[in-house]
């Protein structure tokens, strides 16, 4: 399957790398098959039920590692396809941006959260203090019908507009949030909002 990935590396205002066209067409089809399944009544959970910061977000999510355990991980298209995030060509590029990223290439642990933002949903700025590194992948249906949903970094006066099929990787200490999503005349379960797949990862062993 042909790849057309573009990478941009930044050391300021904090170390991060942005990939465009990260997944190929076949991988995207597999991801959307699972996202569409989750965007049905009673599936995505509120923050209090998925480990989110209750007083900071009203978005809904699922922690896939709690659902697909051990040998059942292969039942998830997303948990299969997102192994691409941990390819050496990806982690090696991130690891050389700054010394604080250098151990990313030796990561031996990760967990995956799928999140959906619809009209009026947001995530106030926060820091994932217990995580060494973060990778956010973004998806939305075309044509895009919502506004907002940018990944925001108020402390750094910086933002990322989260294009479809993009990925941003950064250290876990970077404070970040999501601006409020606005959609007119769209039912929640039609899935025309903003999806993100978050990979929390790092090193558990010396």
Report residues per predicted region.
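Non-heme Fe(II)/2-oxoglutarate
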Residues: 2-100
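Conserved short histidine dyad/triad with adjacent acidic residue
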Residues: 114-128
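A structural signal for short, well-ordered beta-strand segments
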Residues: 112-114, 135-137, 197-201
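A short glycine-rich, His/Asp/Glu-containing loop-to-beta-strand
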Residues: 103-116
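Catalytic core of Fe(II)/2-oxoglutarate
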Residues: 131, 141-142, 146-206
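Short beta-strand segments enriched in hydrophobic/aromatic residues
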Residues: 23, 35, 139, 201-203
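Short catalytic/ligand-binding loop motif for oxyanion handling, primarily in non-cytosolic enzymes
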Residues: 26-29, 52, 121-124, 145, ...
